[in-house]
Amino acid sequence: THYLTYQMLEGFLPRELIKTCRAPNGSSARYDALINGEVDATTLTEPYLSLAEKNGCRVIIEGMYHGTEVASDDVDAETYAAFNRAVKKAVQLINANKRKYMQYFIDRHKGQHPGIETLTVDDFRLSRLQMVDPAPIPEEELRRTYEWMRSWGMIEELSPDVLVDVHRQQVAHEVSAQ
């Protein structure tokens, strides 16, 4: 998620004006760091974004989830395809009535942070929740993202093909479409 934040900030600021710091891993810890004044701004995912807004924080920029899960080599194409079929079905159901499914989302996160217990469905901006079908990462997008990550020094010099098996990804998505 922090990669997306860097990319969005680059749309408004020259790279040399983007100041970063080491922040805790995970939205729960980053939310706490923000609320406790340890950082001035941070990247949050839901439900912590809505929790931050509920507690007076302001959203500066936001983006949406791509819709592709990355699997390890231990996951074969058929298993990945079955997973994608299930996700597609869930996307259809949730997009048909986001409000209906939000309580499941809240319940899933309860116990991870005491603030989550205070959230209700009305605390979420449902238009922010963009559920999209899983799809392969287009090769050009993968290459562009890889080059961009290298330019920030986020990854070592590897081939994008080492990071994502484009062929396996494509096969799995084709199988799930059947």
What are these language model-derived features?
Residues 14, 57-58, 154:
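Short aromatic/hydrophobic-glycine micro-motifs
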Residues 2-23, 106-107, 151:
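Ligand-binding cleft/hinge of the Venus flytrap
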Residues 146-178:
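Conserved C-terminal helix/tail region of periplasmic/extracytoplasmic solute-binding proteins
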Residues 9-11, 26-29, 81, 122-126:
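A short alpha-helix capping/helix-coil boundary motif
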Residues 77-158:
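Secondary-structure end/capping motifs
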Residues 20-110:
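Pocket-lining segment of extracytoplasmic ligand-binding domains
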Residues 16-17, 34, 117, 121-122:
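Mature, folded catalytic cores of secreted/periplasmic enzymes
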